[in-house]
Amino acid sequence: MTEEYIGGVVSLERECFSHPWSEKSLREELDNDQAHFLCAVADGCVAGYIGVQEIVGEAYITNVAVSEKFRRRGIGEKRLEEAERGAIKRGCMLITLEVRASNDPAKALYKKRGFKEVGTRKNFYSDPREDAEIMTKFFDR
């Protein structure tokens, strides 16, 4: 992500999440060498993005969002593939995330990409309160 996409990512955060990241938090990620935000642009706007933080050989997906009007076009899957390739290139051995237990479309995508459910975080989300499924994928070496 570059400075030019901050506004679009902020808008997408507000569209997709009940507790969106602030513009300040997103700007701080620009200066974080361990953070990588990969944006997809369509029709002149940020159509989707994925955020990843890498720490000691592990990649953690912090955010995945695709604008409702651009869903079902492969944008999320392409960003996920790009995030995985980058994590492997930088030496990560696994990638992990949390997803709402009720988010069946997202869970299906992650399973298609080789993620496995490895645990649950009770009441992880609010508005509405919901458990998170923890999903992890180990990279072949």
Each language-model region and where it sits:
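Short, solvent-exposed loop/turn elements at beta->coil junctions and helix N-caps
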Residues: L26-E28, R121-F124
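Conserved acetyl-CoA-binding loop-helix of GNAT-fold acetyltransferases
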Residues: V66, R72-G86, D104-R113
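C-terminal "cap" of GNAT-fold acetyltransferases
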Residues: M93, R100-D104, N123-R141
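Residue-level recognition of the GNAT/N-acetyltransferase active site
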Residues: Q53, S67, R71, E98-S102, ...
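ABC family nucleotide-binding domain
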Residues: F70-R71, K111-R113, V118, R129, ...
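Acetyl-CoA-dependent GNAT
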Residues: E3-K69, L80-E82, G86, R90, ...
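Conserved GNAT acetyl-CoA-binding A-motif
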Residues: A87-E98, L109, R121
